[in-house]
Amino acid sequence: KPGVKVIKLPADIPPERFIGGGCGLPTAMHAVQQAQVQVGDSVVVQGSGPVGLSAAILALLSGACQLIVVGAPQLRLDMALEIGADAVINIDELGPEERIARVRELTGGRGADITIEASGSPAAVPEGMRMTRDAGRYVVVGQYTDAGDIALNPHWDVNRKHLEVRGTWGIDFGHFYRSIRVMAKYGDRFLWERLITRSYNLEQVNEALDD
């Protein structure tokens, strides 16, 4: 119908690969665009779901020289290491202060140049701010629903460290288009279809929703 845009899926992208990228890859595309990752940056990604792992991939393709993924479960963190993460931090094993200290340790005491929040947990936001270096950039992409309020210290977490905070909301046609181009070129390297952990037939649709 009028106003609807359609992109033809290239023949060399298997349907499973496209579904694995889903809306997570275009969402991550928008986030990394906002993050403005540059060659040589250290990047932390909070969240190891489809958006977080896709953001990790795009950060590497944008030139990040150090990539740290914070999340759970270990299966997803293992995927992050296969993608090319330099280090992973399991939130089931370390508490918030320990996670911040670990990022500081891995970045030589500075903190990350850029942190991308893709966890969906409001508590991750002040934690991620403290993982980011002075005059660094913090991008929030995971807060797609109202999951509650957070407490932060605007003096120490934002003003004093001159932190730049950016948010992203939604995706447009261009993010889908560029995502398909990325998948066509790098799909055999990053294998988005690995993000699919189970498939359902149409008769199992209610079971899929319950799961």
Question: Predicted regions: what is each one?
Answer:
Residues 1-4:
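A short glycine-rich beta-alpha junction/loop motif
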Residues 6, 11-98:
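Mid-domain Rossmann-like dinucleotide-binding core that forms the NAD(H)/NADP(H) cofactor-binding site
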Residues 34-39, 61, 78, 82-164:
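Glycine-rich cofactor phosphate-binding loops and adjacent beta1-alpha1 units
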Residues 63-65, 111, 189-194:
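A local structural motif
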Residues 73, 144, 171:
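Residues in the short beta-alpha loop(s) of Rossmann-like NAD(P)-binding domains
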Residues 102, 126-130, 173, 177-211:
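C-terminal hydrophobic helical "lid"/dimerization subdomain
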Residues 136-137, 152-194:
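Rossmann-fold dehydrogenase core element
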